[in-house]
Amino acid sequence: MSKITLSSLKSSLQQGLKNGKNKLNQAGTTLKNGLTQTGHSLQNGAKKLILYIPQGYDSGQGNGIQDLVKAANDLGIEVWREERSNLDIAKTSFDTTQKILGFTDRGIVLFAPQLDNLLKKNPKIGNTLGSASSISQNIGKANTVLGGIQSILGSVLSGVNLNELLQNKDPNQLELAKAGLELTNELVGNIASSVQTVDAFAEQISKLGSHLQNVKGLGGLSNKLQNLPDLGKASLGLDIISGLLSGASAGLILADKKASTEKKAAAGVEFANQIIGNVTKAVSSYILAQRVASGLSSTGPVAALIASTVALAVSPLSFLNVADKFKQADLIKSYSERFQKLGYDGDRLLADFHRETGTIDASVTTINTALAAISGGVGAASAGSLVGAPVALLVAGVTGLITTILEYSKQAMFEHVANKVHDRIVEWEKKHNKNYFEQGYDSRHLADLQDNMKFLINLNKELQAERVVAITQQRWDNQIGDLAAISRRTDKISSGKAYVDAFEEGNTSPSIHPYSIDNKNGIINISNTNRKTQSVLFRTPLLTPGEENRERIQEGKNSYITKLHIQRVDSWTVTVGDASSSVDFTNVVQRIAVKFDDAGNIIESKDTKIIANLGAGNDNVFVGSSTTVIDGGDGHDRVHYSRGEYGALVIDATAETEKGSYSVKRYVGDSKALHETIATHQTNVGNREEKIEYRREDDRFHTGYTVTDSLKSVEEIIGSQFNDIFKGSQFDDVFHGGNGVDTIDGNDGDDHLFGGAGDDVIDGGNGNNFLVGGTGNDIISGGKDNDIYVHKTGDGNDSITDSGGQDKLAFSDVNLKDLTFKKVDSSLEIINQKGEKVRIGNWFLEDDLASTVANYKATNDRKIEEIIGKGGERITSEQVDKLIKEGNNQISAEALSKVVNDYNTSKDRQNVSNSLAKLISSVGSFTSSSDFRNNLGTYVPSSIDVSNNIQLARAA
């Protein structure tokens, strides 16, 4: 490269001005504006910048100090020649008098002796400044030095009110100002240790271009780099300015009045010493190593360029710009320690990735920031001499090119770090013969068990089961997803994993068990147990069965999406076994979203069936949101529809030919229910964007849908919170209306019908029926056979119609003598102490007709033959008729008490009385609408229990 003399430089500059006047004017305007802004910033922060020369100090002994004096005059920097005693405030307040910069009560002082010593210690600067024989050129070079210092101070101290600081000694302002001066002093020291010449920099740029000429997509860039103007030895060089600019990024923080104290301290003090020494070397070496690994050039000139550029880049701002990334890495690393102990180090890999890429990102980001701010460092030179013009051209022509190169290098370095993550995962999988991300889910599940062990162990007592079987769906994990995206192994990850664990009271860890769950084929087997009772609990929503496959597709230049394909299975088959089990399916996802409206509501969905084989035990099954097929097997089995808003029931067994078989239709109206949806996880690796589709449960609002359940070998059905319709079979049925206004028809058979809450209509039909209205004002019909009616306090006002048979009405929690019996029209009203009435319609109709119609012959028996109190005491229909007649349409309290006393003294009836007491107590303790969510083992009286007592009652 040819050398440039001062005269040739002037000639070249004149030609450049002639050929590119507009461009140079634009550059000059930018730089002058930068200088003006710098001056304003400095004036806002301090009274003035002063070059201090102690009285008696021989400036001639310095190497180039006279040039600095002339430059100070040229730049409007005041020169002091005073006694050192006037600087006491600087020494006492900041202890900076042994450094280049300090404070006085009149402004910021640049100490000439310290600067002179710096020039002596660093011959590069001294030799470059030269002697008095080339004073015109040296003034320009000195302008560059002082102009850079002036620029830094303008940024560093623009957030400080110096007048207030000096007058009030505000401690916060003092610390901030001290931090700024400490930083600037370190930066000037950095200049002395890293000065380079412009021609060396230009040579590095040119050679870098030659190394990049064969890189795909960068051919044009390499030509531009090699065709830069011949800059020669025009000045001290860009790297003096670059060294000064290492303070620019920190200045941005220090000058920001809104910045936190923590950030200002970090920018001004904590990192100031680090950026001068080992950090610069470490980051430079790291970036070079990454370039080698990425197949990029690392020759001497390129290494020198990187080292000199990183010297200005590794500033506090470079850390603060990516503080979140480093904090994230620290959090993930701390998080990873637990899972490493559980056999998964993916979180540590993720933390290392964020830390390494954070270092790269910090360096490159700050380099770009510093390059964009170079005009502040050369402002003085461009305004006062010819030296600034070629530097300005260099800034305008090269900054954008360097930025492009660095961005290209950054992505390559990111991908190299990602490749290391990829290789570690592949190496682990080869060694352990297992999917790495599945291991991640396994570790998450083990940690979950550890966190919830006390709760899970106590479930045995809460659910009254010898063994609790917990089925847990580990959901999509964002950190595992990030790792798959970074390593480009997105086709190997799954949406989660399901686990089966067993817990027994007294054990402090999950029990060894033979249970299994097969997601691909939709099989859950919990049948092999030697326990008498067990409770099956789906702890988290279980996704639908099927096998996932993924395909990674490139969407754009740097964007990829991994599409999810599912080979679905349309049902879960659950085998429970012979233990008496409680199984709750309400937390199983049975609906798959297919279509959405503009608001994101589900307007079309697909059904996933549950097929439950219960075995020989006495089982309780809670039905979920969609089609359920249940085979109860042997034992007394109950099916509950009492949880969730899963629609009103229409149960029809009128055509069934097998006992315990029912068809249950449900319309699940517009509401929220668990649906399986497809979501997208996004991760960015530099410029590379990765999207991964995965499944998740979503409690979405949906339009209505209809399902039909099929029940076999089921002894009891508990209804929903809606208005249900029950149509019984020709066999014995047990129905519980639950909440809502229910219509219950027992049809044939000896039925047990419970209305539950709400104003229900209950018809026992043919057979010997057991009828309980429950809360609400119910209408109850018993039919022609031997029926038992039950009422307790709080059940409301019930109307009973009976016709024939030997019937009984039991008040389960009221003594007979505390009731009031009245004739109202042709009906009998029985009133408890709360004022609730049980009205037996047409009780006296036949008698009234016989007394008013000649030769009338009774055709129907509309009376209930026995009315029973909570202690088993009773009154017969004949006694009621007699006492009502004697008491003028009401039984007196004395007459009723006598009936009770006479009954209690009858020894031959005592055993029967005890049996009836058990019957009434049993019925009184039962609430058909109870939600057994917290106690799946709660005792519910079965038809077998009740019928035994009914037979005793009838025998009486």
Swiss-Prot record:
* Record carries keyword Lipoprotein: yes
Membrane topology designation: Multi-pass membrane protein
Name where the Hemolysin-type calcium-binding repeats lie: 718-735, 736-753, 754-771, 772-789, 792-809
GO MF annotation terms: calcium ion binding; channel activity; toxin activity
Location(s), subcellular: Secreted; Host cell membrane
Q: Which residues cross the membrane?
A: 238-254, 302-320, 383-406
Which keywords accompany this UniProt record? Answer: Calcium, Cytolysis, Hemolysis, Host cell membrane, Host membrane, Lipoprotein, Membrane, Myristate, Repeat, Secreted, Toxin, Transmembrane, Transmembrane helix, Virulence
- PTM info: Fatty acylated by LktC; the toxin only becomes active when modified.
> Which biological process annotations from GO are given for this protein?
killing of cells of another organism
Signal peptide interval: none
The main location is secreted
User: What's the domain remark here?
Assistant: The Gly-rich region is probably involved in binding calcium, which is required for target cell-binding or cytolytic activity. The three transmembrane domains are believed to be involved in pore formation by the cytotoxin.
Role summary: Bacterial hemolysins are exotoxins that attack host cell membranes and cause cell rupture by forming a pore.
Family classification: Belongs to the RTX prokaryotic toxin (TC 1.C.11) family.
Name of protein: Hemolysin
- The species this protein belongs to is Actinobacillus suis
Q: What gene makes this protein?
A: appA
